[in-house]
A protein has these predicted regions:
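N-terminal regions of ATP-driven nucleic-acid and macromolecular assemblies
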Residues: 1-175
Length: 175
């Protein structure tokens, strides 16, 4: 299926939240495909957690590329259809409704979990995803500075939409 995750900040702990799944998938020999990540993940921490990096693929194009959006969408669609892929994560901003539907169909045709990570400013512009989540960092104190990917943090996870699930459920997680 396809899940849309809205992020309050680019490094709000989304990858850390998914780490147990990433470890499991990589150890099962499944591919983890990251498309257009906002920064290079701390792969040394991934290895420490147990991720097998030979099963991780990062796809990133130069920002000067004229067809960058088309290339990212094509790469994500192929990842969703690829049966050897366990999870495909795509960081993007605005996405046309028709393209979101096409990605949902690609996700349903394969066995890959597809995650689209977008800034929370797009909350009023939902994609055709099976589920929507909002991730917000809970600051520890007024002097709060945005954390590194693996600094201790607390997250508020809001379940906005899901098939058969009640809407607007909130969970507090400490990572």
């Amino acid at each position: 299926g396809l899940v849309e995750i809205l992020l309050s900040t680019p490094s709000c702990g989304a990858l850390r939240l998914m780490m147990p799944l990433l470890v499991k998938l990589s150890q099962e020999g499944k591919w983890i495909i990251l498309i257009n990540p906002p920064h290079t993940p701390l792969f040394s921490e991934w290895v420490r957690e147990g991720v097998i990096l030979s099963n991780v693929l990062v796809i990133d194009f130069p920002e000067t590329d004229e067809d960058i959006e088309k290339k990212y969408l094509w790469a994500y669609e192929q990842a969703l259809k690829f049966h050897g892929c366990g999870i495909a994560l795509f960081w993007c901003d605005e996405l046309a409704i028709g393209k979101g539907r096409r990605l949902k169909l690609s996700a349903e045709s394969g066995e890959t979990l597809g995650l689209i990570l977008r800034p929370s400013i797009y909350r009023r512009h939902p994609l055709a995803a099976s589920s929507r989540l909002q991730l917000d960092i809970i600051p520890k104190d007024p002097e709060y500075i945005e954390p590194r990917e693996y600094a201790p943090l607390s997250l508020k996870v809001t379940h906005i939409k899901g098939n058969g699930a009640p809407n607007k459920q909130e969970y507090i997680l400490t990572l």
